[in-house]
Amino acid sequence: MPGEDRMNQDEAKRGNNFTCFHAGPKEGWAQFRLEPPDVPMSAKGKLFLRSLIGSAGLEMSLNVVPPGQGMPFLHKHRQNEEVYVVVDGRGQFLVDGECIDVAEGSALRLGPAAARAWRNNSEAPLYFLCLQYRADSVVEGGTADGQKVEGKPAWPD
């Protein structure tokens, strides 16, 4: 990317009020693997970002599902909602028995108790972001929490 700091997946740029981690282009997301310690399976194509970026209130993951693949079991959460944002591709989510078609630009919010699974029923990879946060934790949304800061942006040349 133009102007980006040269970072690899093992390092992040940190400042007083930010952390920036570069996972690389979405076409490389398949290299990531989730191997939960208490589950006898692994998930290829999933990278959790919370610890990498130092987030205190949100878990987020990058995900890619190859054609013909999907989540092999239903799951739900005890207290966290999830929002899935499809970045590229097409697929389906099964939510409480209802099949929902998704495609690039789809955003799907699921309450904690929703039994869910997903699959890629297309011929191209399905890329999505998953944002997980405690249900009812956002008190003010939109711009209500924002505050204007004096001055103008001073971009480096």
PLM features per residue range, with description:
Residues M1-L58, V139-D157:
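A short, N-terminal "cap"/entry segment at the start of jelly-roll beta-barrel domains
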Residues G54-L58, P66-G70, R90, R134-S137:
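Short, charged/polar surface micro-motifs in flexible loops or helix N-caps
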Residues G97-P112:
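Short acidic-glycine-tyrosine-enriched beta hairpin
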Residues L58, N63, E98-I100:
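Well-ordered beta-strand scaffold positions
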Residues S42-F48, S61-H77:
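Conserved short histidine dyad/triad with adjacent acidic residue
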Residues Q79-E81, V85-G91, D96:
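Glycine- and acidic-residue-biased ligand/ion/polar-headgroup-sensing regions
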Residues Q92, P112-V138:
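Ligand-binding loop in jelly-roll beta-barrel domains
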Residues S61-N63, Y84, L129:
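Conserved hydrophobic/aromatic positions in well-ordered beta-strands
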